Amino acid sequence: SAFLAFDPDNPVIVYGGTYQGNIDKWDAATGESKSIKQYPELGLSVAPKDSKYRYNWNAPIITSPHDRNTIYHAGNVVFKSTDEGQSWTTISPDLTRNEIDKHGPGGGPYTNEAAGGENYNTITYLTESTHEEGVLWAGTDDGLLQVTRDGGSNWTNVTPVGIKDGIINSIEVSPHNPTAAYVVVM
């Protein structure tokens, strides 16, 4: 399973991802598929500490509800494209705890596989507010909740006090209060 993103009013173009931040753009009308990964690296058997970016096995991909030509993708940082993935801009610093001692090969010391997708200190969920363009919420697999209210220029750690390390796997912006979000930590 992985994230999929598309324009609900015109679902012909679909973005889908896999491990290591691989992301494809698929055109349902033509059947064509094209890799649009931000940084062309396939780091099988490369320790995450030696990679440019760290991606969760299921790295978030979303389209903006305000401009469907804008897509976001996340690793340990957030990327933005306004041209359907032809070019990308990094719009955040590392939003994780960036614990280098946990960036061993194959996900070590937590998992011991060599597929290259077992990274830690990654963004596991990303959403843009439907109330206001440029308000993005990001959750990580190390329990951090971050928000930007200016399209990524500035990010604030808004992790509630007392929350321990955990995987943030869902963020829903309140439909009634644009400054609040509901978060699931597991």
Predicted regions and their residues:
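Beta-propeller blade termini and top-face loops
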Residues: 1-186
